[in-house]
C-alpha cells in the first residue's frame, strides 16, 4: 500500500486556534487518503530539518502532503520545507519553494503584482492617502488583525506597527485599507489543468458603520465573537465581477508559477475595481475552511480533490526528473 507522509506545523505551546487547526486539517486529509487506499504517516515539522530529512528517507513515501504554514511560529521559514523536498526529489503537494517564497513575503508579492500591472493596495510610503491597515509581512491566518489595525493617519500607523512588533515580533507593514467588499478565489490543479473554483464573498453582516469590515483574527478563529458570527460566506457574486476575479486569479497563478492549489484574496472598491490583497500558496484545506466550501459548491468531492493533489504532485515530480 503506497504511503503518504503528511507534514504539519508542530503544535504551538500557546495553543493558538490557528495552529491547532493545522492538526485537524491533517486528520481530515489522512482520513480522505485512507479512503483512496493510501497508508498515511504524519510528521510535525520544527527547526530540526536534518531529522526530518532522515525520517523521509527512512519512510520513502509515495508523496508528501505539505501542510506546513510556519516553522515554530515563523512564517518567514515557510519555504524551507518545499526546498528540502525538492532537494530530496520527493513528490509533494502544493507550490514550489520559489512560489512559496515569493508569495509568503507580502511585500515581494506586491512588488511583483505591481510590475505585472495587477492592482494591489499601496504600501505606506508610496503615493496615496489612507486609511491604512497594519499587517504582518510573513504571517497569515489574520495574526494581529483587529479593529485597531485600521487607522487614518500615517503617524497612527507607525504607532500600531511598533505595538505589533513588540507583541508578536517579526516584520510588519501598513498598506492602504480599501473600504468595500472582500472576495476570494480558490484554484486547484485538476487532471485537465488549473481549475478555478466558485468565487466566494465574505460578507460583514450587521457591522456598525464605524467598525472596520475586515477578516480579523477573531472573525477567523474566535467562534464566540461578534466578528465570527457576523462574517458570512456567500457564493452569490454577480457574474461580471466573478468573471473578472476568476481571470485575475489565473493571471496570479501564472505570474507566481503556482502549482497544486492556491487562493487569491481581493478587496473590491466602490467603483468595482479589484485589488489583490494576498496570494496564498498554501491555503487551509480543513473541511470547514473556504477552500473546501468552494470545492463543495463546484461539485468536487473532498476526497477527489485530495486525490487530484497527490496525482499532481507525482506528475510534477516525474516532469522534474525527466
Features from the language model and the residues they span:
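Short, basic/glycine-rich phosphate-binding loops at helix/coil junctions
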Residues: 32-35, 139-141, 220-229
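ATP-dependent carboxylate activation and anion-phosphoryl transfer catalytic cores
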Residues: 81, 236-322
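ATP-binding N-terminal substructure of ATP-dependent carboxylate-amine bond-forming enzymes
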Residues: 1-91, 97-98, 103-104, 108, ...
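Hydrophobic beta-strand scaffold residues
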Residues: 40, 63, 91-92, 120, ...
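Phosphate-binding site of ATP-dependent enzymes
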Residues: 154-247, 270-275
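A short beta-strand motif that forms the metal-chelation/ATP-contact edge
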Residues: 4, 65, 133, 186-189, ...
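Active-site nucleotide/adenylate-binding loops and adjacent lid/helix of ATP-dependent enzymes
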Residues: 1-9, 56-58, 100-181, 190-192
